[in-house]
Amino acid sequence: MINHNIISFKKFEAIFEQRPGGLELNMPIEIGSNNVDLTSKPFNIKGGSHYKVKIGYMASEPITDLICQIHTFRKSTPYGRDTQKVGDICANTNDLEFDFPKFGWEQASTQSSSMGDYTIKMYFKGNGNQDLATFFYSFNVAPDWENALPIN
């Protein structure tokens, strides 16, 4: 069970090393929620492109040993797992950011068999492995930017 009101999310950005139409893609979220699910609004990535995500959040109480467990699914099938340590967080901190990956870039596969839908499920845990928040998002990998750019 998630302990409410300790972590609240503020923003979500997908950042690209190169992308026609801008390097940043901001996705609207419900500010103040500790359970964000953007899986019904996937963004698009060209195969082979480098990207990372940035999640803005705030903490209302101190958090010890904050970690983020990241589960990747491809078409609902488990595809990979990662854990990223964040560390200790002070109470009443408003301008925190979580970058994934922490260093460098992720790269979308260029193999045709890897094109398609992906879902990332992030579980934020701290204070003795207590569930604090969840953040889910999805994206599609396409063979070229023409098919990858969002339709507005």
UniProtKB/Swiss-Prot annotation:
InterPro entries hit by this protein: Ig_E-set, RhoGDI_dom_sf
Keyword terms, alphabetized: Cytoplasm, GTPase activation
Main location: cytoplasm
Subcellular location: Cytoplasm
Lineage: superkingdom: Eukaryota
A GO term for molecular function: Rho GDP-dissociation inhibitor activity
Annotated GO CC locations: cytosol; membrane
Gene Ontology biological process terms, A to Z: regulation of Rho protein signal transduction; Rho protein signal transduction
Record-stated family: Belongs to the Rho GDI family.
Function: Regulates the GDP/GTP exchange reaction of the Rho proteins by inhibiting the dissociation of GDP from them, and the subsequent binding of GTP to them.
Protein's UniProt name: Putative rho GDP-dissociation inhibitor 2
Species of the source: Dictyostelium discoideum
